[in-house]
């Protein structure tokens, strides 16, 4: 996932209204087969760029593990759905940093992958990925953090707000108590 996170940084500022996503594809033996990041609007998303990189290096991704900082997209927009493409290429396992908050994705990419028999792990390095994509989430999906926080039990909500604002949980608890 660290390679994918580094790849995502290469895309920051060049993806239009798309998120800056990074991807790495690794063989069952742990060899890096390909890496990529989201290109400009209408161009390859990170997962496809990484698969093309693997192919250009002479590797197949059948049976490989794909690491992506964000859940692969599930709908055909300017580009085909990445989740379907990943499954069709024979990737065995997908490791995701965080779910895509886009209303047309949010878990749908994961569902497509699982229905195709791909093993999916979510939440790997999620705090780091959330911080990395924070600007995009706020810009493109401004209410997503609020909706997610409201759904959490009080202790988890306090921990989340403390992390987001970089303050001690006791300060958040005091603010919430003062507001009541």
Tell me the role of every PLM-derived stretch.
Residues 1-12, 77-180:
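Zinc-dependent deaminase
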Residues 13-17:
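Short loop/turn motifs at secondary-structure junctions and domain boundaries
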Residues 20-30:
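Short beta-strand scaffold segments in enzyme catalytic cores
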Residues 28, 71, 99:
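Cofactor-binding loop segments of dinucleotide-utilizing enzymes, especially the Rossmann-like FAD-
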Residues 38-42:
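A short acidic/small-residue loop/turn micro-motif
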Residues 46-47, 82:
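Catalytic-loop motifs flanking and including active-site residues across diverse enzymes
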Residues 48-76:
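Mobile, glycine- and charge-enriched loop segments
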């Amino acid at each position: 996932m660290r390679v994918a996170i580094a790849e995502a940084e290469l895309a920051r500022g060049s993806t239009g209204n798309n998120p800056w996503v990074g991807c790495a594809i690794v063989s069952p033996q742990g060899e890096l087969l390909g890496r990529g990041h989201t290109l400009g609007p209408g161009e390859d998303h990170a997962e496809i760029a990484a698969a093309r990189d693997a192919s250009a290096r002479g590797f197949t991704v059948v049976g490989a593990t794909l690491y992506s900082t964000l859940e692969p997209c599930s709908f055909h927009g300017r580009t085909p759905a990445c989740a379907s493409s990943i499954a069709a290429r024979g990737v065995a396992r997908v490791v995701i940093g965080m779910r895509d908050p886009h209303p047309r994705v949010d878990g749908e990419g994961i569902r497509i992958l699982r229905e195709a028999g791909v093993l999916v792990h979510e939440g790997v390095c999620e705090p780091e990925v959330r911080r990395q994509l924070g600007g995009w989430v706020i810009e493109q999906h401004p209410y997503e953090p609020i909706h997610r926080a409201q759904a959490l039990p009080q202790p988890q909500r306090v921990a989340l707000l403390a992390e987001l604002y970089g303050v001690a949980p006791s300060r958040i608890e005091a603010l919430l108590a003062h507001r009541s």
